[in-house]
Amino acid sequence: LSFKIIIDESHQNFTDKADAIVQLFKTNKIIRCSATPIVDKKAKLIEIAEEDVIAEGLIKKLLVINENFPQTIETDNQTWYLLERALNKQREIKSIFLNKGIAVNPLIVVQLPNNSDALCDSVEEYFATQGINIENDTLAIWLSGRHENIENISDNDGKQIAVVIKQAVATGWDCPRAQILVKLRENMDETFEIQTIGRIRRMPEANHYDNQLLDYCYIYTLDKAFIEYAKKESGAHAVKKVFIKPQYKTFRL
């Protein structure tokens, strides 16, 4: 009897303890899978081209950032502005799924900075004005010490319209209906950026629908560094520049 070992999310399972368990199987074949692999000079690197994964229908065709943003944003509340854009997109996508008879409820992922209780309150307040809340199971919270309405969130027809997170969902989270990211968190390292974007790139039914709205994923953010990084990853044509009114340029999360 011989074993072949497959380790998913290997970038976070590359530890002495994990290696000790692997060695118990006395295998000569170990496959480590990750979007952000840790370099192992002894391993053979097999890279799967993004185009091949798209062609198989496993991930979305394009990442769209700040779609149709005006050159100057006129708003008193940047957070609510981003959330409104995201919710409008969610409703637009959901209506097409309904018209096609497809039971998918696209999920908005709202990523907060650390130490942002006031910002979390503001996010919940906005969603409450739209009838999205904990009580009716349409809002989920996945924060340290606070997990609400997480059950069945990965189901394509889950009731949750939005989930509020910080870091926990970025790695190893499997929710293919996640399609829209509102990124309020800044200053993440490149590995974390890749993992975060990856959360909204899966196709809910592992196939494309020949409809741009359904086959694309969407990000709404005012994080300039992240916008530049995402431009590099998805193509500059997917981005429109955003200019903030002078009185809001000192705003910090």
Which residues make up each language-model segment?
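Helicase-associated low-complexity regulatory tails and linkers flanking the ATPase motor
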Residues: L1-K4, H11-R32, P37-K159, R177, ...
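SF2 helicase motor core recognition
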Residues: V164-Q179, T196-I200
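Catalytic acidic motif of RecA-like/P-loop NTPases
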Residues: D8-Q12, V169-A170
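Structural motif
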Residues: K4-I6, V109, V164, V182
